[in-house]
Amino acid sequence: MAKTRSPSTPPAPERVAAFQTGISAETRAAAFLMAKGYRILARRFKTPYGEIDIVAQRRKLIAFVEVKARARLDDAAYALTPRQQQRIIAAAEAWLVANPDHATYELRFDAMLVAPKRLPQHLPAAFDASP
């Protein structure tokens, strides 16, 4: 059985730090994408199936971007598991149901690797939705 904490118990400091690191990395990634000409359509889009860190558009392309923050870019590159990819794909399908006007756009699943004191590394088409 999964552990649950009471609503009055504050989260552990390491969880708070990880959350703040994630928010900071997503902000850096979004700024980097905007500098490359993307428009940010959504951040932290939550569904029952999973969450998409960033949904970005450039022309007729929609990019579903997973942001991975680690101490080193090499470590971040290996942090996107097949299970996470499936959850992101399912969440992207939910986003498209909620945003049908984008259904005819080209769709792509990207990764953005973020490490301290380094520019984010954008990996277009990091994975695809084919089985």
From Swiss-Prot:
GO terms for molecular function: nucleic acid binding. InterPro entries: Restrct_endonuc-II-like, tRNA_endonuc-like_dom_sf, UPF0102_YraN-like. It comes from the Bacteria. Gene3D superfamilies: 3.40.1350.10. Disulfide bonds: none annotated. It holds the Pfam family UPF0102. PANTHER family: UPF0102 PROTEIN YRAN. HAMAP family: UPF0102. NCBIfam families: PRK12497.1-5, YraN family protein. Belongs to the UPF0102 family. This is UPF0102 protein RPD_0400. It comes from Rhodopseudomonas palustris (strain BisB5).
